[in-house]
C-alpha cells in the first residue's frame, strides 16, 4: 500500500484478519515472510526497536474504541504526549478535531459519548501521533450502518488529507466502496 491509500482486508470471522494486523503492526512475528515498514524489516528488529517503530509509525484503531474511561478526550491526547513527542501541533490538532467533528467533545468522558463519537475519538488518537500507517481492526463492527459509513468517510478523508496508508480489516463487504 502507498501513502494516501485506504485498503481493506475482507474475510469471514476466524479467517486471520486480526492476526494479519497484529503481524503488520509488529505485535506478533510471522511464521514465515517479513513485514517491511518504511524500509525496516520488522522481523530483523529487536523488540525495543520494534516497539519504537510501532510508536512512531503506526496508529491503531480498534473494534472497541479503547478509550481510558476516567480520562476526558483532551486528557487522552495529553497522555499520548507523555509516551511520544513530536505529535501534531496545536493548530493541526484543532483542525483534526474539527474535521472529525469532536471539537466540542474535548471535556467529555468516554461514557458520555455515543459509539460513533468514541470511534471518532479513537481515530483522532491514532492520527495524533502522526504515524505513516493506520491499522484499523473492524472499526465499524459495533456501529449501525449510518455511523459505520460516517467512520469510513472520516478514515478515507484523513487518509487522503494526511497522506497516510490505512489498512482496514473487516468482514463487512459494504465498506469496499471506501477503498482504493
Q: Where in this protein do the model-derived segments appear?
A:
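Helix-to-loop junction immediately C-terminal to a conserved catalytic motif
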Residues: 25
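Conserved ABC transporter NBD signature motif
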Residues: 33-41
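Conserved signature/switch motifs of ABC ATPase nucleotide-binding domains
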Residues: 55, 108-111, 129
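Short coil-to-helix segment of the ABC ATPase nucleotide-binding domain corresponding to the Q-loop/switch region
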Residues: 71-78
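Conserved ABC ATPase signature
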Residues: 109-119
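Catalytic Walker B motif of ABC-type/P-loop ATPase nucleotide-binding domains
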Residues: 134-137
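Helix N-cap at the start of a conserved alpha-helix in ABC-type nucleotide-binding domains
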Residues: 145-147
Amino acid at each position: 500500500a502507498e501513502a494516501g491509500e485506504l485498503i481493506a482486508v475482507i474475510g469471514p470471522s476466524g479467517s486471520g484478519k486480526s492476526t494479519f494486523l497484529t503481524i503488520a503492526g509488529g505485535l506478533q512475528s510471522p511464521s514465515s515472510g517479513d513485514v517491511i515498514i518504511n524500509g525496516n524489516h520488522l522481523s530483523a528488529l529487536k523488540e525495543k526497536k520494534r516497539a519504537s517503530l510501532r510508536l512512531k509509525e503506526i496508529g491503531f484503531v480498534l473494534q472497541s474504541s479503547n478509550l481510558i474511561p476516567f480520562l476526558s478526550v483532551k486528557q487522552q491526547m495529553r497522555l499520548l504526549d507523555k509516551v511520544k513527542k513530536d505529535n501534531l501541533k496545536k493548530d493541526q490538532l484543532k483542525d483534526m478535531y474539527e474535521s472529525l467533528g469532536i471539537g466540542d467533545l474535548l471535556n467529555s468522558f468516554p461514557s458520555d459519548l455515543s459509539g460513533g463519537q468514541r470511534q471518532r475519538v479513537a481515530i483522532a488518537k491514532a492520527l495524533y501521533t502522526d504515524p505513516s500507517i493506520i491499522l484499523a481492526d473492524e472499526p465499524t463492527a459495533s456501529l449501525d450502518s449510518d455511523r459505520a459509513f460516517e467512520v469510513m468517510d472520516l478514515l478515507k478523508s484523513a487518509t487522503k488529507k494526511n497522506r497516510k496508508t490505512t489498512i482496514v480489516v473487516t468482514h463487512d463487504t459494504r465498506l469496499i466502496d471506501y477503498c482504493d
